[in-house]
Curated annotation (Swiss-Prot):
<dbReference type="GO" id="GO:0003735">
    <property type="term" value="F:structural constituent of ribosome"/>
</dbReference>
<comment type="function">
    <text>Forms part of the ribosomal stalk which helps the ribosome interact with GTP-bound translation factors. Is thus essential for accurate translation.</text>
</comment>
<dbReference type="Pfam" id="PF16320">
    <property type="entry name" value="Ribosomal_L12_N"/>
</dbReference>
<comment type="similarity">
    <text>Belongs to the bacterial ribosomal protein bL12 family.</text>
</comment>
<dbReference type="InterPro" id="IPR013823">
    <property type="entry name" value="Ribosomal_bL12_C"/>
</dbReference>
<comment type="subunit">
    <text>Homodimer. Part of the ribosomal stalk of the 50S ribosomal subunit. Forms a multimeric L10(L12)X complex, where L10 forms an elongated spine to which 2 to 4 L12 dimers bind in a sequential fashion. Binds GTP-bound translation factors.</text>
</comment>
<dbReference type="InterPro" id="IPR008932">
    <property type="entry name" value="Ribosomal_bL12_oligo"/>
</dbReference>
<dbReference type="InterPro" id="IPR014719">
    <property type="entry name" value="Ribosomal_bL12_C/ClpS-like"/>
</dbReference>
<protein>
    <recommendedName>
        <fullName>Large ribosomal subunit protein bL12</fullName>
    </recommendedName>
</protein>
<dbReference type="InterPro" id="IPR036235">
    <property type="entry name" value="Ribosomal_bL12_oligo_N_sf"/>
</dbReference>
<dbReference type="GO" id="GO:0006412">
    <property type="term" value="P:translation"/>
</dbReference>
<keyword id="KW-0687">Ribonucleoprotein</keyword>
<keyword id="KW-0689">Ribosomal protein</keyword>
<dbReference type="GO" id="GO:0003729">
    <property type="term" value="F:mRNA binding"/>
</dbReference>
<dbReference type="InterPro" id="IPR000206">
    <property type="entry name" value="Ribosomal_bL12"/>
</dbReference>
<dbReference type="GO" id="GO:0022625">
    <property type="term" value="C:cytosolic large ribosomal subunit"/>
</dbReference>
<dbReference type="Pfam" id="PF00542">
    <property type="entry name" value="Ribosomal_L12"/>
</dbReference>
Length: 130
């Protein structure tokens, strides 16, 4: 870091909670941003004119990949893909596959959900995205 950023960081460390809260409010106003935690890992930028009208449909940003069914002869291939996607151990992934219909991934982006669906279907499983 540069000397300027080091100096700012040291000054921030000395602020009380009340002062830090006031600083956040001033930064939000000065730069037109929000310090609220983004939903779904993506930050929504406000367009000109402030808040969006209530009539606009809210676009879904988080999706679930649901494993609907797996043919008996495709279980091993689907199990391997489920393990890759979830990072589960062999027993946990096997239990998930055998408990279909079951959510494989939850709260993921549309692209990731489409990719997971494609991979599981290529292995022989039936998948829906909600």
């Amino acid at each position: 870091m540069s000397a300027a950023t080091d100096q700012i960081l040291e000054q921030l460390k000395t602020l009380s909670l009340l002062e830090a809260s006031e600083l956040v409010k001033q930064i939000e106003e000065a730069f037109g941003v929000s310090a609220a935690a983004p939903v779904g890992g993506m930050m929504m930028m406000a367009g000109p004119g402030g808040a969006a009208p209530a009539e606009e449909a809210v676009e879904q940003t988080e999706f679930e990949v649901i494993l609907d069914s797996v043919p008996a002869d495709k279980k091993i291939a689907v199990l391997k893909i489920v393990r890759e996607l979830t990072g589960l151990g062999l027993k946990e992934a096997k239990d998930l596959v055998e408990a279909a219909p079951k959510a494989v991934k939850e709260g993921i982006a549309k692209d990731a959900a489409e990719d997971a669906k494609k991979r599981i279907e290529e292995a022989g499983g039936k998948v829906t995205i909600k």
